[in-house]
Amino acid sequence: MKVKVIPVLEDNYMYLIIEEHTREAVAIDVAVAERLLEIAGREGVSLTMVLSTHHHWDHTRGNAELAHILPGLAVLGADERICALTRRLEHGEGLQFGAIHVRCLLTPGHTSGHMSYFLWEDDCPDSPALFSGDALSVAGCGWHLEDTAQQMYQSLAKTLGTLPPETKVFCGHEHTLSNLEFAQKVEPCNEHVQAKLSWAQERDDEDIPTVPSTLGEELMYNPFLRVTEDAVRAFTGQVAPAQVLEALCRERARFQPAVEPPQPQVRALLALQWGLLSTHQKK
């Protein structure tokens, strides 16, 4: 199983998962169809399926264009709001392409129809992979926008947190540096946070993705997976796990640094990349 990490938009990740024997491929969270097709063409693979983690535009805006270019393409997810959806998936459902298996894990919290995807390959020594969208990120998680903190706790602690610790975690955004800065505020004495933050700063300086992490690593430095730890409880002033999680989300929202609006030239470049502006002007 080969995973191509594809940075797009401002800080999103798309993924192309390749079955190296059959040359079949599955895409996850198609934000920019043209970029995905470019990578697929370069790899010489046949794209057979799109898996969307949730319906937000920055994870699905390329679905319709891709489905138009590739008639018969399966576009799958758990939420009817997903653009160009061809079939709705259920929690625990299994999919397969070649020797690669996919287990669909419903992880509500960020959105009510958020689905994460757990992949492994037959007779392969590589670690399994989790494509977690905005449910779980490196040292963080997505805001719970449509569900309760209890549902989000269930998703993080029970559904994802019990997967094998060697599982590689591929998330939907590059928010690692700010997530770790917040984690350091929550647990200033956590050596795992400090070490990961130093590593992430080096990656950021070199403009290198910080994905994947592993689930075992996340359990050591991600405060949203550490809601039963004394230091995290003390930071929030709460004891019950769901209440700790909700307090963390509130504090993380306050901690989010203010971002200066981009300059006009930068806005134009982003608009071109997002397909909101054409390079061909009418005369």
From Swiss-Prot:
GO molecular function ontology, one term from the record: hydroxyacylglutathione hydrolase activity
EC number per UniProt: 3.1.2.-
Binding site residues for Zn(2+) 2: D58, H59, D134, H173
Pfam families, per database record: HAGH_C (PF16123), Lactamase_B (PF00753)
Keyword Metal-binding among record annotations: yes
Keywords: Hydrolase, Metal-binding, Zinc
InterPro entries for this protein: Clx_II_MBL, HAGH_C, Hydroxyacylglutathione_Hdrlase, Metallo-B-lactamas, RibonucZ/Hydroxyglut_hydro
Cofactor binding note: Binds 2 Zn(2+) ions per subunit.
Residue sites binding Zn(2+) 1 per the record: H54, H56, H110, D134
Cofactor(s) annotated in UniProt: Zn(2+)
Metal-binding listed as a keyword: yes
HAMAP family, sorted: Glyoxalase_2
Known function: Hydrolase acting on ester bonds.
Family: Belongs to the metallo-beta-lactamase superfamily. Glyoxalase II family.
Protein name: Hydroxyacylglutathione hydrolase-like protein
Organism: Mus musculus
